């Protein structure tokens, strides 16, 4: 994969800016403006289109195990948006691609033994609730909701992490001799947010897990002193800002078919023999979801 020199310059500039800040100052009270893109993204898991040069670039720093140090591997993360989607692109380099691990393609099956990349969005910027979108090199989609500022842990539908939550979004990944790559597109119609004076503010955390180093790198800097799930806590997110997004209220239609089969043995009228009666069952229908507004 060829690197864009203007992108590298932007990355180094942002990284230099990050290094002169104290950790407490990185999560600024000021929101960061996300760039709107005008170009077209060929959604194939390789973020190399010209449109990615219009995006906002985010550096990443080690959260664990060696807080605040330089990551063992280079990460280039870009975020932009258009009227329909929030776009996230990541170039996740590896000095030895054989170290890249992906354990599953199954939806919502996340593993700490796998490399992963994802974004946490506190869509109301309330420091309490958030939505998580993750993937692995296999391209698996992993999404869940966070409540109570990530306190209390939890598995599926327990505690503060609800892994049964799903929504509509897409991800594509690719890999080569330099590392692995991610393109995510999240419809704004799949998010709940508020527009105030034409602006939308959300909290954001970026996460990359480098499995062979057992290393978690984040943006912004996340101090592990805040607990095991510190990298999921909305209260530690960086506020980002979008402008002039027109809300969409789409209708999602999911057809379903439910089949079944049962057998009964009944005594005949003469009460001399049991006869088998097969009863196949088939039920079909549609699940329809419609949001009245962007914040309901």
Model-derived segments and spans:
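N-terminal secretory signal peptides that target proteins for export/translocation
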Residues: 1-8
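Glycine-centered signal
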Residues: 6, 25-26
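Structural preference for beta-rich elements and adjacent junctions enriched in aromatics
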Residues: 27-296
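Bacterial N-terminal signal peptides
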Residues: 10-23
């Amino acid at each position: 994969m060829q690197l864009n020199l203007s992108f590298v310059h932007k990355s180094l500039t942002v990284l230099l800016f990050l290094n002169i800040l104290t950790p407490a100052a990185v999560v600024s009270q000021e929101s960061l403006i996300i760039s709107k893109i005008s170009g077209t993204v060929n959604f194939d898991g390789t973020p190399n289109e010209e449109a990615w040069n219009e995006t906002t670039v985010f550096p990443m720093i080690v959260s664990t195990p060696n807080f605040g140090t330089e990551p063992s591997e280079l990460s280039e993360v870009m975020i932009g948006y258009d009227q329909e989607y929030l776009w996230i692109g990541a170039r996740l380099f590896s000095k030895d691609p054989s170290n890249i691990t992906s354990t599953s393609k199954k939806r919502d099956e996340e593993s700490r033994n796998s490399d992963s990349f994802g974004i946490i969005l506190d869509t109301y910027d309330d420091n309490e609730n958030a939505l998580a979108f993750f993937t692995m090199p296999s391209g698996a989609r992993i999404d869940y909701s966070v409540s109570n500022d990530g306190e209390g842990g939890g598995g599926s539908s327990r505690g503060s992490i609800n892994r049964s939550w799903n929504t509509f979004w897409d991800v594509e990944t690719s890999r080569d001799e330099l590392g692995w790559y991610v393109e995510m597109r999240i419809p704004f119609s799949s998010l709940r947010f508020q527009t105030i004076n034409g602006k939308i503010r959300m909290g954001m955390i970026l996460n990359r897990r480098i499995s062979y180093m057992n290393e978690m790198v984040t943006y912004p800097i996340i101090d592990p002193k805040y607990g095991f799930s510190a990298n999921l806590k909305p209260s530690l997110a960086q506020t980002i800002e979008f402008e002039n997004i027109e809300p969409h209220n789409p209708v999602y239609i999911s057809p379903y078919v439910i089949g079944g089969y049962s057998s009964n043995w009944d005594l005949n009228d003469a009460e001399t023999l049991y006869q088998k009666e097969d009863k196949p069952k088939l039920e079909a229908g549609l699940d329809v979801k419609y949001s009245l507004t962007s914040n309901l």
